[in-house]
UniProtKB/Swiss-Prot annotation:
Gene3D superfamilies: Knottin, scorpion toxin-like. Residues 1-66 form the LCN-type CS-alpha/beta domain. Has the structural arrangement of an alpha-helix connected to antiparallel beta-sheets by disulfide bonds (CS-alpha/beta). The modification Lysine amide is found at residue 66. This is Beta-toxin Cl13.
Length: 68
């Protein structure tokens, strides 16, 4: 599974500035999911890959990001 890393409290994606390979996105994807996950910056948000099938990614059901 893959998808955008999401903040559970706000419903917003984790933003990033450096497109492509991005240490911040790799670190955040691994912290949220597990060490074999990978991440990169796609469309200015962290995209995580190699996730388990039940991983929660953006968009969250019944939770909209306000103002972003």
């Amino acid at each position: 599974k893959e998808g955008y890393l999401v903040d559970y409290h706000t419903g917003c994606k984790y933003t990033c500035a450096k497109l492509g390979d991005n240490d911040y996105c790799v670190r955040e994807c691994r912290l949220r999911y597990y060490q074999s996950a990978h991440g990169y910056c796609y469309a200015f948000a962290c995209w995580c890959t190699h996730l388990y099938e039940q991983a929660v990614v953006w968009p969250l059901p019944n939770k909209r990001c306000k103002g972003k």
